[in-house]
Amino acid sequence: MKLRGLYAITDSQLLTGKFLSYVEAALDGGVTLLQYRDKTGDDSRRLREATELLKLCERYKTRLIINDDAELAARLGVGVHLGQTDGSLPDARALLGHKAIVGATCHGQLELAEQAKADGATYVAFGRFFNSQTKPGAPAVPLDLIAQVRARVHLPIAVIGGITLENAPQLVEHGADLLAVVHGLFGAETPQEVTRRAKAFMALL
């Protein structure tokens, strides 16, 4: 599957009071994948918000990904992104079917990407590459890892961690396919600025 472009990731705290308006603004600017990420554990709210996002994604012809919840993804008929401690990738693939997008966090380890490919991943994700507000304690990953992954794991490569319009070009130059962005997109003051940033990120790829 060819995946290339902006991978927008929601943050419930960052988007308090402006969740749908900012997400729609991003979709209006152009988003390849949208990941719904909510770590609160409020299942009813998660289902409601994910359902609302799916409606928006269908309108804008964008693929929705659920973070760390294969059952919710299956319920909505969308993809899933799994961290290293968030359940079995083969089980998620079996649950969602062969056409679903299933992404895997690989931190900074090439071996994890090779295993993810063997387990049926659609794309592999690496990071953090820069200082991240979402996961400030995560270990840094060197830029040259991207080329190593590209040479050995022939899957789309998502990069994450403190990505902004200023530092994103070097990630693309090193071979990244998907720019996974949270604060660098949704930390804007207005929906119009979110749209502008989304367009600018997409123009890099």
Swiss-Prot record:
4-amino-2-methyl-5-(diphosphooxymethyl)pyrimidine binds at Q35, Y36, R37, D38, K39, N67, T105, K135. It catalyses: 2-[(2R,5Z)-2-carboxy-4-methylthiazol-5(2H)-ylidene]ethyl phosphate + 4-amino-2-methyl-5-(diphosphooxymethyl)pyrimidine + 2 H(+) = thiamine phosphate + CO2 + diphosphate; 2-(2-carboxy-4-methylthiazol-5-yl)ethyl phosphate + 4-amino-2-methyl-5-(diphosphooxymethyl)pyrimidine + 2 H(+) = thiamine phosphate + CO2 + diphosphate; 4-methyl-5-(2-phosphooxyethyl)-thiazole + 4-amino-2-methyl-5-(diphosphooxymethyl)pyrimidine + H(+) = thiamine phosphate + diphosphate. It comes from the Bacteria. Pfam families: TMP-TENI. Coiled coil: none annotated. Belongs to the thiamine-phosphate synthase family. NCBIfam families: thiE. This is Thiamine-phosphate synthase. The gene is thiE.
